[in-house]
């Protein structure tokens, strides 16, 4: 079982819109293997506050997602991650749902440090791409940072995950 907390900020200059997000996720991987395939699922909740500096517009989006997870891990510690799921976003009195997907790869750089690369997206949108680092502070407690681009914007992410 893993619990994760994430924070994101995305500021666009044209139009001048700021997004501030906070999220929480629970991951359960009942089929685990040190090498080869592992499989599980993830449930996520997120909130994004949107502020448009050009107008007095401000609102909050809420998002719920359910994702199937598959990982293929090599003996070298490298891992390929494949995800597919569905999300629902509620904002300004409306609700929309979309299929989601992701593919990622991680490389061990040191005993507790990994480089990460991922491409992810959702139905009807172009993919986002990100590069990052994940560091295991103590056994089971990981912090991560990533920066990326996609859909005409640049973004950064900071996260923390606790495996228990």
Residue ranges and their predicted role:
Residues 1-164:
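Transmembrane beta-barrel domains of Gram-negative outer membranes and organellar outer membranes
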């Amino acid at each position: 079982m893993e619990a994760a907390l994430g924070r994101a900020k995305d500021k666009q200059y044209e139009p001048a819109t700021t997004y501030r997000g906070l999220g929480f996720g629970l991951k359960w991987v009942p089929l685990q293997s040190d090498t080869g395939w592992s499989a599980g699922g993830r449930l996520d909740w997120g909130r994004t506050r949107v502020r448009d500096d050009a107008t007095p517009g401000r609102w909050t989006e809420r998002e719920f997602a359910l994702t199937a997870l598959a990982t293929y891990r090599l003996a070298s510690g490298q891992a390929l991650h494949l995800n597919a799921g569905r999300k629902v976003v509620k904002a300004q009195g409306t609700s929309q749902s979309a299929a989601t997907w992701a593919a990622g790869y991680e490389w061990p750089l040191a005993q507790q440090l990994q480089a990460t690369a991922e491409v992810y997206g959702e139905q009807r949108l172009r993919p986002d791409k990100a590069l990052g680092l994940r560091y295991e502070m103590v056994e089971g407690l990981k912090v991560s940072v990533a920066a990326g681009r996609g859909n005409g914007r640049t973004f950064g992410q900071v996260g923390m995950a606790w495996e228990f």
